[in-house]
Amino acid sequence: AHWAPTRRSPMHHQHLAAGAVMTDAGLWKRPWYYPHAAETIDDAYIREAATTRQTVGMVDVSTLGKIAVQGPDATTFLNRIYINGFAKLTVGRARYGVMLRDDGMVLDDGTTWRLEDDDYFMTTTTAQAGPVMQFMEELLQTRWTDLRVHLSSVTDLWAGMAIAGPLARNLLAQAVPDLDWSDEAFSFMAVKQSTIHIADTEIECRIARISFSGERAFELYVNADHGAMVWQYLADFVARFDGCLYGMEAVSYTHLRAHETTV
């Protein structure tokens, strides 16, 4: 037998309590689907996808790789490693990017958020977080040694959840009322930072309007220590809107139905 570590999101036990069937994604355990009664996997993921399309759904995205890219030359660095340009990305905006290996094959894809002039928040796919970090460190240490850029793996520091569906904005307007959720104020690929108030606790969060399924959707990240609390808080709102939690099978299904790129 070969020993291998297992990584779990901050909301792992809540997924089990909700009846999730878990699956492996890289080193992580992620919810595969949430069956009701005697549902098969096909029954469950089709229901989850349909509910998300009709009302609202929430999925755990904590396992995505997360890398802080900081420094005076961070923009130049990102503009070199992605095949699409990042030089004109303004503060408060996110952009989807594709990264290639030295042989021209795709290494990874994901979104990068510009939080400040010299501060970016990069997300990677779950399985490629390590290889992407290694690739970028190699570039800085052996090829572009003149660039003033600092990389930090912050995957374990942030709990992430995506809220998708036609009622996603309505839900978040109630859950995080400090923000203006209108299309004018919160356009596609916009990035905001706010505070979630749960009882006497104030929790800082970063939110981007990003869709992986073709529906209106938002990604929300909070400190990992508050992940379980925020997940339960938002799950209660999901239930009020007749929505559901959904797993990776529904993610893949809705992603393909939306004709989105899959790496």
Mark where each language-model region is:
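Internal alpha/beta scaffold segment
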Residues: T126-S153, A217-F218, V222-A250
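Residues forming anionic-ligand binding surfaces in small-molecule and nucleic-acid pockets
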Residues: A50-S62, D108-D118, S152-S153, I203-R216
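Acidic, proline/glycine-enriched N-terminal capping motif
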Residues: A1-L100, M105-L107, E249
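Well-ordered mid-protein domain cores that form the structural environment of catalytic cofactors
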Residues: K88-D118, M122-E138
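The conserved catalytic core of RNA pseudouridine synthases
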Residues: M189-D225
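Conserved small/polar residues in nucleotide/adenosyl-binding loops
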Residues: T254-T261
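Internal amphipathic helical hairpin motif
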Residues: P72-V106, L139, L167-I203
